[in-house]
Amino acid sequence: MSVNTDFAETEVDERQINLTRFPLFFPEKRTFFLEGSEYFNFGTSSGGGQYHASFLPFFSRRVGLVAGSQVPLLFGAKVFGRLGDTNISVVDVGTRRLDDAAAALVLPAKNLLAVRVSQNLWEESRVGVIFTDGNPASSGPAGADYNRLAGVDFRYATSRLFGDKNFTFDAWGVYDWWPDPDRKKHQGYGFRLDYPNDLWDMNSSYGYYGDGLDPGLGFISRPGVRTWSAMGAFMPRPDPGRGLGRYVRQFFVEPYVEFYWDLAGRLETRTLAVSPAVQFQSGDRVEGDISSTYDVLPFDFEVADGVVLPMGPYRYATFRVGFESASHRPWQVELNRHFGRFYSGRLAETEVGLSLRLKGYVTLGAVANLIRGRLPQGDFDENVYELKAGLFLSPDLGLMNYVQYDDVSKQLGWQSRLRWQIMPGNEVFLVYNRNWERRWDPMRRFAPLGDHGVFKVQLTIRP
């Protein structure tokens, strides 16, 4: 149970640059929703990687966050656990009325509900159902702007295929109800075959997402499409101590294909890629990608401020080279360079990450993401910079500072977060947030946008 809940102690999101016409995916970081979140794994959402970011029937970040504004919570109740072979999770949240004049956003008080029940089968399989009720973003009166979703999924998993191999088959289907007379196809369904093993790692998945599939408490990146993808990775290990095996731990060759069609069967996007990589005995890793993309823009698309791509088909090829140093060292380096064609022009992206651990007490990190676009419709430069500094006097007491700047919003943000765990479940937080905006009035400067400080004591009562 939680009453008058706020999440002031939560770490801020990492800023991202979006060069697609689809929404970005930001992971949940709030402890109240993270605890027991694995019980809501549904269909292929438990498969990891990109499948977490394509469709989730329940996505807890929809609760308490609407269009960048925080919606105050009146209460939150959650029950999760296992009864024999039955897994149960229920989340029920009541929100207060929101009247945000600055964002021109008015939302009435609401009740939001998500229920997930699954039954373990055999040793590693399961069958389950999910139900959600509520639309956090609706501005209509209670009951008039409803959004409900129901779904069923099945997983067959074994670790003894051919004696000692892993294999998983997932199938799922959902339907949602909400008042939209123009969109008739509210269903979604799909399957995934997965063979994740050491020498061969292969998977293939298919998904159908109706144009009316829009779960109020879920996440969907691309409705109104059918999609199929397949990947097969060959990962041999040289004989250690002989020849290449003295230096190389494992080779990777990973071809990948992905197709998107609209519901009338017309091809929208096709991606063909291959990703070679080498992991050395030291733990360092060198990798790359070669990718060919065909994409049809159904409308004029503003890829950056003032840079508009005309609707129509585009073909382009991109390349990536990357390096990641071993994590066992006190310092770590990660480098990625993307380059090649991008729609009607060219794009180059450089990612640099550095981290340093000093005797377990101090951590330092810096990340820079630099994008340079050169198109006939216009040029653009977009950058994100991040700095992290942590001081940990013990596993229970630490101070974390996080600074971010991007030149799209032109905002600089700083969060300082002190956490003291008195005992498991009982914590004290002292959090300070401050933001600035880069302006030219009349000279270049960072103008303060505001600050916010919070002192919070979190107590857990366990019967």
What name fits each language-model region?
Residues 2-245, 249, 291, 296, ...:
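Outer-membrane beta-barrel channel domains
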Residues 72, 160, 164-463:
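Exposed, low-structure sequence patches enriched in small/polar residues
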